[in-house]
């Protein structure tokens, strides 16, 4: 049950990221069907760089991806039916997590939902430019999740915390 829950958790999170990339890529490409002025190109460059750094590197590579992999490894090593059944939600830190992790996971999710709603009101090419940045960040995130997941399940010691409540009781 543990390994199946871990696989389900990682697959579910990967599908969530992949689905967003799949849905946003055509909108990003559509932006290029419009005539770009110099300021569109400048904004595109800034957005791509910012999203690669802030979302891809800082958000995913330094935080989300290693934590998701660590939580999937936790399911494998500490199998519980609810954790396995709700693997993607467990891996994203929505339950059986430290209080800080749950608050952060829920807050970030709501923030993303609000940003998605707001960006939908933008006209092209602005929406496509922002979506291009999001695709870059999500792509970076998906690749980093695959790499960290591989490391978590092949290394003897994975150095990232799953941020589960039991860790706080030993300190």
PLM segments and residue spans:
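Surface-exposed extracytoplasmic segments
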Residues: 138, 143-144
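Hydrophobic alpha-helical membrane segments
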Residues: 82-90, 101-120
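Transmembrane helix-loop junctions in multipass membrane proteins, especially transporters and channels
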Residues: 27-31, 59-66, 121-125, 156, ...
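Long, highly hydrophobic alpha-helical transmembrane signal-anchor segments
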Residues: 1-52, 110, 114, 120-138
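Membrane-proximal soluble regions of multi-pass membrane proteins
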Residues: 55-98
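Cytosolic/matrix-facing juxtamembrane and C-terminal tails of multi-pass cellular membrane proteins
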Residues: 146-171
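Membrane-embedded alpha-helical bundles that constitute the cytochrome b-like, heme-associated redox core
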Residues: 7, 52, 59, 91-98, ...
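Hydrophobic alpha-helical membrane-embedded segments
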Residues: 32-70, 144-148
């Amino acid at each position: 049950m543990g390994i199946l829950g871990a696989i389900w958790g990682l697959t579910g999170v990967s599908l969530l990221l992949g689905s967003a990339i799949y849905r946003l890529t055509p909108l990003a490409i559509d932006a290029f069907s419009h005539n770009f002025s110099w300021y569109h190109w400048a904004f595109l460059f800034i957005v791509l760089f910012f999203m690669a750094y802030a979302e891809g590197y800082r958000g995913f590579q330094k935080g989300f991806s290693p934590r998701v992999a660590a939580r999937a490894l936790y399911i494998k090593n500490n199998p519980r039916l609810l954790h396995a059944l709700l693997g993607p939600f467990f891996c994203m830190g929505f339950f059986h997590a430290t209080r800080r992790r749950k608050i952060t996971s829920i807050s970030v999710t709501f923030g993303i939902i609000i940003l998605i709603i707001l960006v939908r009101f933008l006209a092209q090419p602005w929406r496509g430019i922002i979506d291009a940045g999001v695709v870059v960040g999500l792509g970076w995130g998906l690749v980093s999740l695959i790499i960290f997941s591989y490391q978590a399940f092949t290394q003897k010691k994975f150095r990232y915390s799953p941020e589960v409540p039991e860790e706080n009781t030993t300190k």
